Regions:
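The feature captures the beta-strand-to-loop junction immediately N-terminal to the Walker
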Residues: 43-45
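Helix-to-loop junction immediately C-terminal to a conserved catalytic motif
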Residues: 58
Length: 243
């Protein structure tokens, strides 16, 4: 699927999105658009709503109110089409611990009817550096290695959109480079990425657009070409000091 074939100008459209848990409002009338091919990094402190946002976009959690469109599909109406168009890497790997690495990948691949599955597994395993551990049980792997497996699983069905929730947690610098390479290699062309993180330095280095989320809403947006890393850190600290 080429960029020009994709429905509309935006990969993700969020309008007036709110999410409450009891009396606590995690997201407040949030508006956001992500264009095809963007790498948007969202920063924010603990409790800002970052993980809640990714869970909603990943169809794990339902919004309380608002509208969300992903790859042209309405979140409330077409979960299955959205899931085919997204790959998710969370801060916890969320793998089947009683299965081997290759069994985890096969399960995911069959769920999405991945063509030439064994060849595709070899491709992604080579890409993220797990080709030597495919037969090992997941539960004996380190957190960082499990994270590599979760990256392989997320890109296995070659989704055009990646959703990353603190993906660098538990990864060394080499693995962060693997993550960056993996999410940017797609058979369909350039991937669209939405990543949430607390790491200003790594987020700035990876993204081309940045946003700051605080108290459940976007309070700042810019591009990494318009704002260098030191200016981002200063802007973030100033905003956090006022909120």
């Amino acid at each position: 699927m080429n960029m020009e074939d994709k429905a509309g100008s935006y990969a993700i459209v969020i309008k007036a999105l709110s999410k409450t848990f009891g009396t606590q409002m995690a997201l407040r009338q949030l508006d956001l658009t992500v264009s095809w091919g963007d790498f948007l990094v969202i920063f924010g402190p603990n409790g800002a709503g970052k993980t809640t946002l990714v869970k909603i976009l990943s169809t794990i959690t339902s919004p309380t109110s608002g509208q969300v469109s992903i790859a042209g599909f309405d979140l409330k109406a077409d979960y299955s089409s959205i899931r085919r168009n997204i790959g998710v890497v969370s801060h916890q790997p969320l793998l089947y611990q009683d299965l081997s690495v290759i069994e985890n990948l096969r399960f995911h691949g069959r769920m999405f009817s991945v063509a030439s599955l064994e060849n595709r597994i070899k491709e992604v395993a080579d890409l993220v550096g797990i080709q030597s551990i495919l037969d090992r049980k997941t539960n004996i792997l380190s957190h960082g290695t499990q994270k590599r497996v979760s990256i392989a699983r997320a890109i296995l069905h070659d989704p055009p959109i990646m959703l990353l929730d603190e993906p660098e947690t538990g990864l060394d610098q080499e693995a962060v480079s693997v993550l960056s390479n993996a999410i940017n290699q797609s058979e369909r062309g350039q991937r669209t990425v939405l990543m949430v993180t607390h790491s200003l330095e790594r987020g700035w280095a990876l993204g081309d657009r940045i946003a700051i989320l605080a108290r459940g809403n976007i309070v700042y947006e810019n591009t990494t070409t318009s704002l260098d890393q030191s200016a981002l850190i200063e802007t973030y600290n100033n905003l956090m000091g006022r909120l």
